[in-house]
């Protein structure tokens, strides 16, 4: 009978630590993921919602469900638990599913560059990236300060005269080749590099060897000796003070050629003549005196 019926009220758990699960990183062509949240205690209920990005939730009331149609980038889902009249009745937690693009280009730091003082800056030309992949510039040699170390086309300031080498590192999550690196070298030439001077001409005897006296060059400028006339073997063609051997008697002419990159000054060439005299040449003899009768 109705006299034996007792009304009942649902009992909700007093507390709960509701968790939307661990963040995930995936790579195309996959566009699906499994959501795994903590299960609320009945009669509490849970519901999934899309916060940002894209995704179709198969069962938005199930803590463990499938989401399809993820987009490349960051996709955020929220697990909301309704715990009735308890303290903190509505609690939420979010999970982020980051989808990386398998077709993201491998790292390319761009072409090497030649720059001349007084400039100490240039614009880098790294390969573009497809987010959420990230790219980062770093200094391998020389100096440089990046305006934005994560921009492929950033400006780098504070270059030093000489060789400055930078790495462009691209990180692409869990995809194949997740980390690729390429390097670029920026050569900064000194606009104050001296005008080429091959040194003073030399007159020698009883030797076939001498030391050349070319003007010094400031790296990365390059100087090179070449034989223009006569004979001779230059021991180190790029040393302004190289030894030259094997010269023959007569005139031996050498050029000191300096290349100073894109600078207007400091490039060119100069010549030096090394004359080798023969120690065995006959002494002067004008012949016998002669008398002539008018």
Feature locations, PLM:
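C-terminal edge beta-strand
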Residues: 2-8, 90-100, 179-189, 268-277
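Short, solvent-exposed loop/linker segments at the N-terminal edge
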Residues: 24-31, 113-120, 202-208, 290-294
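Low-complexity "stalk/linker" and mucin-like segments enriched in Ser/Thr/Pro/Ala/Gly
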Residues: 26, 47-62, 138-151, 226-239
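Solvent-exposed loop segments of extracellular immunoglobulin-like
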Residues: 41-48, 130-139, 218-226
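Short, solvent-exposed loop/turn segments at the edges of extracellular beta-sandwich modules
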Residues: 82-88, 171-177, 259-265
């Amino acid at each position: 009978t109705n006299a034996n019926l007792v009304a009942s009220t649902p009992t909700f758990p007093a507390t709960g630590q509701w968790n939307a699960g661990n963040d995930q990183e995936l790579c195309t062509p996959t566009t699906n993921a499994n959501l795994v949240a903590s299960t609320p205690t009945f009669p509490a209920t849970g519901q999934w919602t899309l916060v940002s990005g894209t995704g179709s939730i198969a069962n938005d009331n199930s803590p463990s469900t499938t989401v399809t149609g993820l987009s490349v980038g960051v996709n955020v889902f929220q697990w909301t638990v309704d715990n009735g009249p308890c303290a903190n009745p509505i609690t939420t937690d979010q999970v982020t599913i980051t989808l990386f693009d398998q077709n993201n280009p491998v790292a390319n730091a761009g072409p090497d560059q030649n720059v001349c003082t007084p400039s100490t800056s240039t614009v880098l030309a790294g390969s573009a990236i497809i987010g959420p992949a990230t790219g980062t510039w770093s200094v391998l040699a020389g100096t440089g300060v990046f305006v934005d170390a994560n921009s492929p086309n950033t400006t780098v300031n504070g270059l030093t005269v000489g060789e400055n080498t930078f790495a462009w590192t691209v990180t692409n999550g869990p995809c194949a080749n997740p980390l690729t690196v390429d390097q670029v070298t920026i050569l900064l030439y000194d606009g104050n590099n001296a005008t080429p001077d091959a040194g003073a001409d030399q007159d020698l005897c009883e030797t076939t060897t001498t030391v050349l006296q070319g003007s010094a060059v400031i790296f990365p400028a390059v100087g090179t000796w070449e034989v223009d006339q006569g004979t001779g073997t230059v021991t180190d063609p790029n040393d302004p003070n190289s030894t030259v051997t094997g010269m023959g008697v007569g005139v031996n002419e050498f050029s000191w050629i300096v290349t100073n990159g894109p600078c207007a000054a400091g490039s060119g060439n100069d010549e030096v003549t090394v004359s080798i005299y023969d120690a065995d040449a006959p002494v002067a003899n004008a012949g016998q005196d002669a008398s002539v009768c008018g």
